[in-house]
């Protein structure tokens, strides 16, 4: 990767951290956002599971809030407005924690996370899609590592080197 970076008058250290740029598309194929992801980050699975387990805590401020079909609340009701802002902040913080970056802006920049979509919050659909994506990417990267390791250890597993060099 470092070889592929054009001279940007950058004098620092460039490290390939495995980051990839991913487009977020709706069902019609339209790009609705972009985020950066490191599919080889082994900690991402634990972070995703933590967010999934904490989802009820994240949305707890919304328990007694009437959410409009467009994902908003009555602006005149200060308590509902404050509850929505608190839940949104919790969700954005959790999502940005997941990817250590711009997740919330990328996914929720064009649609409010608590907008209802097919009986669920939009953020639930987004997080489910991300979970499936993480699983596929991680499995693919692990398969690459296993393939590489097996090339180097094949002779030892088959007994080819059992008695040492002769």
Question: Residue spans of the language-model regions?
Answer:
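N-proximal short alpha-helices
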Residues: 17, 77-80, 114-118
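Generic signal for short, ordered secondary-structure residues
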Residues: 30, 34-37, 73-74, 86, ...
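C-terminal charged interaction modules
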Residues: 93, 97-166
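Acidic, aromatic-enriched beta-alpha/helix-loop junctions
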Residues: 41-83, 87
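Short, charged/polar N-terminal "headpieces" of proteins
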Residues: 1-57, 148-159, 163-166
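Generic detector of short, locally flexible boundary/turn motifs and exposed helical patches
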Residues: 1, 71-72, 96-97
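Short, compositionally biased low-complexity segments
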Residues: 23-26, 54-65, 96-103
